[in-house]
UniProtKB/Swiss-Prot annotation:
Monomer. InterPro entries: Enolpyruvate_Tfrase_dom, Enolpyruvate_Tfrase_sf, EPSP_synthase, EPSP_synthase_CS, RNA3'P_cycl/enolpyr_Trfase_a/b. This is 3-phosphoshikimate 1-carboxyvinyltransferase. Pfam families: EPSP_synthase. Catalyzes the transfer of the enolpyruvyl moiety of phosphoenolpyruvate (PEP) to the 5-hydroxyl of shikimate-3-phosphate (S3P) to produce enolpyruvyl shikimate-3-phosphate and inorganic phosphate. It comes from Baumannia cicadellinicola subsp. Homalodisca coagulata. Its main location: cytoplasm. Phosphoenolpyruvate binds at residues 23, 97, 125, 172, 346, 388, 413.
């Protein structure tokens, strides 16, 4: 039987949210620290399903670490070299895209048989562009069920020089190559084919690699120059920023039904591109204030917007909900075709669920247009086991109707405390 959570109408939000660690940073930091020379203490690590999958995989790969009781700090004994195993094994990564993809690349530098797999949805998320690039470097990779999708059998072999990667579907393919390439035996260039989606995530990856001692040069994100036979070095302590994507839900709540909400743990100096969500809210009319370690949002009249969201696909979903509360016209989110290969087909799912609450929605191949409802409808929201759909549609409770979320615990993928924190700033 499916679990349901009904949220009653929220009259006002006000308060401060201390953000848990970023999922994207947490999993990158774990992999970098594991391969770095020296011991690294990760602070404000996220405790979620995606991070636990990465930790479990690293344990199976022989990495020693010690978690604090609350799992928010982790001390890792880095091995100072690429990951290796003494025997064949299988790694299960659930539906964690960054964990699975980054480990696929990292484990092409060793020569034991390793099977990498995930849940049903992960087996329908394409990985062919990454596999094609790794095979250019002589990596031995075999599809075990259907071409271009996990599960995969890895047999090592990555060696040869320059490679070309298609990043039109996911920047995680390039991130995976960038983090692996310095540990390979040769210098190389990585050429980016086509349009690079979600470019801010590449900036995040490069900033984190720099913190672990590796600097990568690039030419306008088209060519990346990697020095081989390099070594990651522990920074000693590494602070995981609060999750800027998850901050978007609370900033949006304030823009819709504030009061004022401040999110802490992320601010003007963040390495996360999703902090730019606050600028989009400001362009829609919200009042935004910045600090080094916080972003604050106060309610104001919100207008519709027509915007290319290719760089910020996750927070584009939050904008789709904000669009329900605008006072004029239609909001159009463009260039979001890669929504279709996320945790679910988010273009179809968002269009379907937005219509349930009364919006008039046009779903194109690469865009979504949303006209606010004349009157909000009480609805039961299918989440498709997608954490972001659950969190986005919780904000519909900021209207004058209740909203029911199916399978609310899907948020445990990246934000187990989401509903608790939302309740803490809400007046019903």
């Amino acid at each position: 039987m499916q679990e349901l959570l009904t949220l009653q109408p929220i009259v006002r939000v006000n308060g401060t949210i201390h953000l848990p660690g970023s999922k994207s940073i947490s999993n990158r930091a774990l992999l970098l620290a594991a391969q770095a020379l020296g011991k690294t203490c990760l602070i404000n690590l996220l405790d979620s399903y995606d991070v636990r999958y990465m930790l479990d995989a690293l344990h199976k790969l022989g990495i020693n670490y010690c978690l604090s009781i609350d799992r928010r700090s982790c001390e890792i004994d880095g091995i100072g070299r690429p990951l290796r195993v003494d025997t064949a094994l299988e790694l299960y990564l659930g539906n964690s895209g960054i964990a699975l993809r980054s480990l696929v690349a990292a484990l092409c530098l060793q020569n034991k048989n390793i099977i990498i797999t995930g849940d049903k949805r992960m087996k329908n998320r394409p990985i062919g562009h990454l596999v094609d690039a790794l095979r250019q470097g002589s990596a031995q990779i075999h599809y075990l069920e259907k071409d271009n999708y996990p599960p995969l059998l890895l047999q090592g072999g990555f060696y040869n020089g320059d490679i070309t990667i298609d990043c039109s579907l996911s920047s995680q393919f390039l991130t995976s190559l960038l983090m692996m390439a310095p540990l390979a035996s040769q210098d190389r260039c990585i050429f980016v084919k086509g349009r690079l989606v979600s470019k801010p995530y590449i900036d995040m990856t490069l900033a984190m690699m720099k913190s672990f001692g590796i600097v990568v040069q690039h030419d306008q994100y088209k060519i990346f120059y990697i020095k081989g036979k390099s070594q990651y070095r522990s920074p000693g302590h590494y602070l995981v920023e609060g999750d800027a994507t998850n901050a978007s839900y609370f900033l949006a709540a304030a823009a819709i039904r504030g009061g004022t909400v401040r999110v802490t743990g992320v601010g003007s100096n963040s390495i996360q591109g999703d902090i730019r969500f606050a600028d989009i809210l400001a362009n829609m009319g919200a009042i935004i204030r910045w600090g080094v370690n916080y972003i604050e949002c106060t309610r104001n009249s919100l207008c519709s917007i027509d915007i290319d969201m290719n760089a910020l696909p996750d927070t584009a979903m939050t904008i789709a909900i904000v669009a329900l509360f605008t006072y004029n016209g239609v909001t159009t989110l463009r260039n979001i075709y890669n929504w279709r290969i996320k945790e679910t087909n988010r273009l179809v799912a968002m269009a379907t669920e937005l219509r349930k609450v009364g919006a008039i929605v046009v779903e194109g191949k690469e865009y979504l247009s949303i006209k606010p409802p004349n009157m909000f409808k009480i609805a039961k929201i299918n989440t498709y086991d997608d954490h972001r759909i659950a969190m986005c549609f919780a904000l519909v409770a900021l209207s004058n109707v209740s909203i029911t979320i199916v399978n609310p615990k899907c948020t445990y993928k990246t934000f187990p405390d989401f509903f608790k924190l939302l309740k803490g700033i809400s007046i019903t």
